[in-house]
């Protein structure tokens, strides 16, 4: 039987040495929301708790300023 190889999750922000996650960096924030607009949990992305809190805050600010949508386009 073949064993399933699970890739080790790592925090991208720790590896890059990011101090603060900026709400204006839409390209980065889009990687951490689903197609329906939900914030992806850290157990899936591998983000550390400190950066997950900053990420959630940045996404919520970007939504408030209409830089990111709250939900997907309902058609």
From Swiss-Prot:
One BP term from GO: translation
GO CC terms: cytosolic small ribosomal subunit
Domain of life: Bacteria
Database matches in PROSITE patterns: RIBOSOMAL_S18
Keywords from the UniProt entry: Ribonucleoprotein, Ribosomal protein, RNA-binding, rRNA-binding
Gene Ontology molecular functions: small ribosomal subunit rRNA binding; structural constituent of ribosome
InterPro entries: Ribosomal_bS18, Ribosomal_bS18_CS, Ribosomal_bS18_sf
Record keyword rRNA-binding present: yes
Quaternary context: Part of the 30S ribosomal subunit. Forms a tight heterodimer with protein bS6.
Primary role: Binds as a heterodimer with protein bS6 to the central domain of the 16S rRNA, where it helps stabilize the platform of the 30S subunit.
Family: Belongs to the bacterial ribosomal protein bS18 family.
Name of the protein this chain belongs to: Small ribosomal subunit protein bS18
Annotated source species: Pectobacterium atrosepticum (strain SCRI 1043 / ATCC BAA-672) (Erwinia carotovora subsp. atroseptica)
């Amino acid at each position: 039987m073949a064993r399933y190889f699970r890739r080790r999750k790592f925090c991208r922000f720790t590896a890059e040495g990011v101090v603060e996650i900026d709400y204006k960096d839409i390209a980065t924030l889009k990687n951490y929301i689903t197609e329906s607009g939900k914030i992806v949990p850290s157990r899936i992305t591998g983000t550390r708790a400190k950066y997950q809190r900053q990420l959630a805050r940045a996404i919520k600010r970007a939504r408030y300023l209409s830089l990111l949508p709250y939900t997907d386009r309902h058609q």
